[in-house]
Amino acid sequence: AGGLVDGMKCDERGNVYVTGPRGIWVFSPAGRHLGVIGMPEHAGNLNWGGRDWDELFCACSSSIYRVKLKVRGNRVAYMNMR
């Protein structure tokens, strides 16, 4: 399946989440492919959210999908500004 990488985010463990063909591809900090979180549409971009920062929101072709995970997103300094 064809497709291009667009969105990219990291979790608190250093895993990398990248939108691509068939959904969100997950890689370990060492670069090992851990799996794909399937999406019903072409995945375009993504961001962390939710009260505990453990939900991944993915903007697809015509919808936004939310995936609850067992890991939190990596909070970078600019996300904690008030």
Predicted regions and their residues:
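WD40 beta-propeller blade core
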Residues: 25-26, 65
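Beta-rich, blade/repeat-based domains predominating
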Residues: 1-21, 40-54, 61
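Blade-level signature of beta-propeller repeat domains, shared across WD40, Kelch, NHL, RCC1
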Residues: 45-82
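Short loop/turn segments that connect beta-strands within beta-propeller blades
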Residues: 27-32, 70-72
